[in-house]
């Protein structure tokens, strides 16, 4: 069975490391790499710096051989799981911020879900 690796894209400064790790996994398993961005209603409120970082992360994913996909929805974890299920993804690579989240983003982290 071919390994199908899914890496989740974000504007996080650490996302580049996650993308490189996923690309190495895809190469090691002789599999395919897909990079997924979940666009939420809050994506339009992203600051200029975050927008530029996201563009850079998308570019890195493309350079790493990933097929770039975008889905839309409010529930990021649901969108990732549903995309993975429908696409036959065998492994999901996501990062987790070490920083405490406040305000709108408080609560259970994506990794914990």
Language model region names:
Residues 2-49, 55-63, 69:
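Small/aliphatic-rich secondary-structure junction motif
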Residues 64-91:
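Structural beta-alpha unit
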Residues 96-113:
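Glycine-rich, Arg-bearing micro-motifs that act as flexible, cationic patches
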Residues 15-16, 77-78, 111:
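Short, well-ordered alpha-helical microsegments
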Residues 43-45, 78, 101:
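Generic structural signal for helix capping and beta-alpha/helix-loop junctions
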Residues 15, 50, 73-74, 107:
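A conditional alpha-helix N-cap/helix-loop micro-motif detector
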Residues 50-54, 86-88, 110-111:
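Short, hinge-like loop/turn segments at secondary-structure boundaries
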Residues 37-41, 73-74, 97-98:
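Short, ordered loop/turn segments at secondary-structure junctions
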């Amino acid at each position: 069975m071919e390994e199908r690796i899914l890496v989740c894209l974000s504007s996080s400064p650490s996302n580049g490391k996650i993308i490189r790790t996923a690309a190495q996994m895809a190469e090691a398993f002789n599999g395919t790499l897909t990079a997924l961005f979940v666009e939420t209603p809050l994506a339009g409120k992203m600051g200029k710096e975050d927008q530029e970082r996201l563009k850079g992360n998308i570019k890195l994913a493309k350079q790493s051989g990933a097929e770039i996909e975008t889905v839309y929805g409010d529930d990021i974890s649901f969108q990732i799981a549903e995309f993975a299920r429908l696409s036959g993804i065998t492994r999901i690579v996501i990062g987790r911020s070490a920083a405490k989240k406040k305000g709108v983003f408080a609560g259970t982290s994506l990794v914990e879900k």
